Regions:
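Single conserved hydrophobic/aromatic residue that forms the stacking wall/gate
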Residues: 1-8, 12
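Short, acidic Gly/Pro/Ser/Thr-rich loop/turn segments
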Residues: 6, 41, 96-97
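Short acidic, glycine/serine/threonine-rich loops at helix termini
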Residues: 9-10, 45-46, 169-170
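Structural signal for hydrophobic packing residues in well-ordered secondary-structure cores
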Residues: 13-20, 38, 42, 162
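Flexible, glycine/charged-enriched surface loops at secondary-structure junctions
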Residues: 18-31, 151-157
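Short, conserved secondary-structure transition motifs
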Residues: 25-44
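Glycine-rich, small/acidic residue-mixed loop/short-helix segments
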Residues: 49, 53-173
């Protein structure tokens, strides 16, 4: 018997072949998310960061008088003086950084990898990182610690964020 789902799959394969479509799973979707700099709960933020460190400060209504809430003044202060910032990293070599890998300058831990991948679109080894603001400038050289953070290090530098289409000029559909 031929089920509806297999018939749909046949149409997808037949029509998609002409358009260059290929089946892709969650790993491909996650790579695209990282390239685009899209944050994911549980990776880039988990409720332990303020909205500005988490990269969702745009959702906090600090400027309107109608939107008053407990903690508004504290959040204004946090926005003005952030402790951490979400940045992009480009790593040297082909070993991808993983969620939770530590980021160092010398012996000091200055950040943590939130997501990383070998980007097939950009042909680069990239990551998202929450880092102390003093090390968040583009071009800053850091090292990603593997194993215990000290035994093996991967050279990296802070780069523009998001990695892919940073000015959002691609057509949206």
């Amino acid at each position: 018997t031929h089920s509806a789902s297999s018939a749909a799959s046949d149409v997808y394969k037949r029509q998609g072949k002409n358009e260059g479509l290929i089946p892709a799973g969650f790993a491909a979707l996650d790579k695209l998310r990282i390239e685009a700099g899209l944050i994911l709960f549980g990776n880039e933020f988990d409720g332990q960061q303020d909205p500005f460190e988490a990269g969702i400060g745009f959702a906090v209504p600090l400027k309107t008088k109608e939107e008053d809430f407990i903690g508004k003044e504290v959040l204004k202060e946090r926005k003005a003086n952030p402790q951490k910032k979400l940045v992009g990293l480009e790593l040297i070599g082909k070993e991808a950084a993983g969620h939770g890998d530590c980021v160092h300058v010398g012996r000091s831990q200055v950040g943590v990898i939130t997501s990383g991948c070998l980007s097939t679109t950009l042909n680069k080894n990239i990551a998202l990182c929450r880092i102390d603001t003093q090390y968040s400038s583009e071009g800053t050289e850091v090292e990603v610690g593997k194993i215990d953070g000290h035994q093996k290090r991967i050279a990296a530098k802070v780069v523009g964020f998001p990695h892919f289409d940073p000015k959002k000029t691609r057509v949206r559909s």
